Amino acid sequence: MAIKISDAPFSKRVEKGLQDGFMRQAVSSAQERLKTSKGSAEKELGNWEEWRTLAEEIRSHTLNHIDFYLHQLSENVEKAGGHVYFAQTAEEANQYIKEIVSSKEAQKVVKSKSMVTEEISMNKALEDIGCEVIETDLGEYILQIDDHDPPSHIVAPALHKNKEQIRDTFKARKGYTKSENPQELTLFAREQLRKEFLSADVGITGCNFAVAESGSISLVTNEGNARLATALPKTHIAVMGMERIVPTWEELDILVSMLCRSAVGQKLTSYVTGLTGPREDGDADGPEEFHLVIVDNGRSNILGTEFQAALHCIRCAACINVCPVYRHVGGHSYGSIYPGPIGAVLTPLLEGYEDHKELPYASSLCAACTDACPVKIPLHELLIKHRRVIAEQKRTARTEALAMKGFGIGASSPMLYKAGTKVVPFLLFPFVKDGAIPKGPGPLKGWTDVRHLPAPAKERFRDWFKARQKEGAHD
């Protein structure tokens, strides 16, 4: 997999999402449930806005001094007996990981949930050299055995599937014979995955945050699969985006608290794991060898720009859980492993506008995402900045550019504007029915197909205002 998950045009992806009734119902239900639990978790913590401000300051400070903290992290990982590799591109990261796996003659790799490994298409790179990669996060495992179906949500990757679909997938791929009861499905998956953990040669994880002062990585999960992936195989490879770093354990404490409350509405997830280097003498478990792969893949190009705040993201999906656009079209409509508002901001930055120029427009600009973000990323403002860049680079449709140019000329000329307010209502009059325009002409058709368009007022505002002024003069 890579950042881009579909070659279908944006309009086709959206149309498919709108027609998926189950997905829309599932997303709506999940958004309401997560909104309620997040609100309760915020109240329990108290002073939520102050915590948000503190989290924002931590992320901003860290990114402004990221060269220092990455150097400190690297030194401390190596002091603890680990190995560090800085990968400028996805290809470099995959090549390094393949070399490690090949050197161990590994036939099987177990992997915990990691967005950055999906971003760089790590699974495919390992499969190309004959290594079997097993996803151990339950949602990712379901998607993997279902013909590598892409995730539709950052935290709940299989949100778009119902229990009947999961039962059928387990039945077809793994010989499952029981019902669609969620508990039975989960127990079956656990039985399957335990075998994989015990026979794996290498464990690969992501990294929620790396701690620069100690050279540690942290893993935040609810299933415990990341602990097994790091405790049982002899070699552990952690892959992180270069921005996923904190200076000290004190900052980690704050950001993990914000992450858990914002993602799933819990004080903490079931498992918060800190790992420092390989196993030491006397340790009961843990890897004999530890590698940390720090991935750039376009992130350094965002540093120092007006979009730097996008790198503050802690992957909680709070913005996704309140987005009205995501609610209606689902995650696959974005065509990226990063869906929702943060995906609409981040994807064009990492992959360019060529295939993703529509994403900044997949927003109502209601700013619910900005209000929900625990690290105060001004998401709706960044979307507007994207739109400005797209317009400046002349990437908009030719018809749209001509329409905006025509409107600009008309709106900046009092004479043309005044004439337009008389002519346009006259031209639209034949399409008016019961005080509205149910089927607009030309470009308006796309609007009236899905929205209500009131008929133009019979009396222009400027005429109404002049009349009231005259009435006032006579009083």
UniProtKB/Swiss-Prot annotation:
GO terms for molecular function: 4 iron, 4 sulfur cluster binding; metal ion binding. This is Lactate utilization protein B. It comes from the Bacteria. Residues 304-334, 353-382 form the 4Fe-4S ferredoxin-type domain. The keyword Plastid does not apply. Keywords: 4Fe-4S, Electron transport, Iron, Iron-sulfur, Metal-binding, Repeat, Transport. It comes from Shouchella clausii (strain KSM-K16). The gene is lutB. [4Fe-4S] cluster 2 binds at C323, C366, C369.
